[in-house]
């Protein structure tokens, strides 16, 4: 192995260590934010503040906080020298860790505070410009940029691969299992197991309606051709033959629901299997989606939010929910009860809208205030 190979191996191992430390620190920072939101009213955690919870629970909260804060501090100190190697997504995680560390950093003495408040010899903007030029002139900057580009490219390829797997594998398993395994087995066992082809009221109603239409068609054809209307015995014989055909069709349709349930179950198992064996790829996909979503402009985020809300909880959403519920009922062999559909449409979109507004108020308002401002402006102008 040449020196270049050794250096490449060392660099990859170092990059993996940085990513692991960053993920651990980021999860600790999110834990602290969750504790702040749930127990301290979205304010900094104060160990000396008595909460309205049992003392044992408060001790557990403080123990989690101290552990997470220590992890954030160690992660911040470990990654700070290598911050120039982070991409945009990793840098956002680093910024969150830095915010938590600065928020809970021990307060300095009055003398150190006065010294820190003294004016700098050079403006910070000028120092930042000098540091930027220094990093650009660094001989290793090109290798760092290339490594970052390769990491982002690999992340994109892995994300596209896992998305295709999550979509195609369940669909293929569903169709193949239904066509070659489930359908032959159900058709073979249905005559011997009556519960597989149990009667359904909606199928009986459809069969009766088809039989009535068939009788009317016979009389209509006779009138068009100028023939005499079939006698009662001939009509009875034709209706009996048609009734047997309709019964066979209804028996076959009655097994479709069980076939659909078993095929959907097979697709769900395939989806879970893909998720289990591709845990690392799913973590990369989550980071890729975070970067794609947070990389959108404020107007694009507001547009996506308005599109989602108008589609699912907006003025025209009841018609869509009605079609969706009827399709689900037919897929699983349930009668499409109008009362249940109307009750669902009257309650579920309201609950969904409430959850969505709470998410905007508690989470999005803190993560992206400019997006919330743009959203309010677009709603106000519409």
Swiss-Prot record:
Keywords from the named record: Cell inner membrane, Cell membrane, Hydrogen ion transport, Ion transport, Membrane, Transmembrane, Transmembrane helix, Transport
Membrane topology field: Multi-pass membrane protein
Source domain of life: Bacteria
Protein localization: Cell inner membrane
InterPro entries documented for this protein: CemA
One GO CC annotation: plasma membrane
Broad class of where this protein is predominantly found: membrane
Membrane-spanning segments: 156-176, 257-277, 305-325, 340-360
Keyword RNA-binding belongs to the record: no
Entry keyword annotation includes Cell membrane: yes
Annotated GO MF terms: proton transmembrane transporter activity
HAMAP family, sorted: CemA_PxcA
UniProt function note: Required for H(+) efflux immediately after light irradiation to form a rapid H(+) concentration gradient across the thylakoid membranes. Together with PxcL, contributes to transient H(+) uptake following dark to light transition.
Protein family according to the UniProt entry: Belongs to the CemA family.
Record-given protein name: Proton extrusion protein PxcA
Taxonomic source organism: Prochlorococcus marinus (strain MIT 9313)
